[in-house]
Regions:
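Basic, Lys/Arg-enriched alpha-helical interface segments
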Residues: 1-66, 74-81, 88-103
């Protein structure tokens, strides 16, 4: 899969240094694997779930559920654009925002 930018990972590593190994591991899985569909990705990332307030956005728990990654994923084109890597509190705030600000 082509991860469009590493910047969100670098920023998350700086903000959450205790989760750095898990973030690097996740980035490596995304960059080294090819996933034809969400079910195949879920076999590597069991926490993968649809972010229901945006089309083609997905959520992955990171570092034992310490962080959440929210990303646009196009399985046909093999592209991932990470929108946010945040704590659960920030994830709840973002969910509330996207719920009330529809596309």
């Amino acid at each position: 899969v082509h991860v469009i930018s590493r910047k969100p990972f670098n920023e998350a590593i700086a903000s959450f240094p205790g989760c750095a190994i898990a973030l690097v591991d996740l980035l490596n899985v995304l960059e080294k694997k090819t996933f034809s569909d969400p079910q195949e990705m879920k076999s590597y990332l069991p926490s993968l779930d649809n972010f229901k307030y945006r089309k083609k956005w997905w959520v992955v728990d990171v570092a034992g559920n310490s962080l959440r990654l929210i990303a646009f994923m196009d399985f046909r084109l093999q592209k991932v654009f990470v929108k946010h890597i945040v704590s659960h509190a920030e994830y709840d705030r973002l969910t509330k925002y996207y719920r009330s600000h529809t596309e």
